[in-house]
Amino acid sequence: MEEPQITVGILSGKEIEFSFPESFTTPDGTKVSGAQKAVYQKEKIYWSGKEYDELIFYPQPNAGIFFELKDVTIGINFHWERKEVQRFQGALKIIVEGETLTAINVISIEDYLTSVISSEMSATASLELLKAHAVISRSWLINKLRVENEKWKATIQPDSAANSPHSTLHSQLIKWYDHEAHTHFDVCADDHCQRYQGITRASTPQAIEAVSATRGEVLMYEGKICDARFSKCCGGAMEEFQNCWENVRHPYLTGKRDYIPESHASDSEKQITGPAIQLPDLTQEEEADRWIRTSPDAFCNTQDKKILSQV
């Protein structure tokens, strides 16, 4: 059975520079190698002396073959934002979007996930951490593809979300920025979706094993794949889904402390948890101020250098 493929939007611009260290082929069988440049001209793609509506380049069936893209922006809107040359496996597709060109990587889901867990966290992390990340990332991705295939779109109703018992935003404008904004590819390559940097960041045997060992595994709730959006650090508290993303309530994504109370912990969990402290009412200014200015116990509040080196 052929492995499912997805499309990942990598970069956009008036010009896109790319290269093929080894030969790629176009749909008509033309072999292409070396440095290339595609330019936007009057709603067309200008490449190799001709105009096109769309370009696609397929790799030869050789293990390890890749293409390179110049000036890929990583860390968009973060203090460490920068451009770099990145390498990708799979096919390269170039389309016209508005008055720019967009480079899209066509890649298998499992190869995509190997890159994601190597880009989002250290590829040298322990196997169990990488396996957990693989399951979460696969769940988020497949849930997103399922939603789009069913042509489901959330109707955003800010007033309804503001009426959540955990929200005081009754008179403020609420706006969600979601991955559904992408119309010509499945996901983007930055933190807006999941960080994906192709094979630029070296994967490791344990990253490959983590994806392989969990192949097909996803998080489920009442027979449906979970929308498993994740963050690297939660500040000790998890917000309700509808207050951050779409005006949809998910019972499995609720506001609570990033902590297991001792009374509910297993024997092994009790060894890593402190006193059973519940999440305070952060809608109260005094409680929120105390929470922000102190360092409350939380899973992501750790000084363990071994753990910190892996995430």
Model-identified regions with their sequence ranges:
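Conserved, single-site charged/polar hotspot
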Residues: 1-311
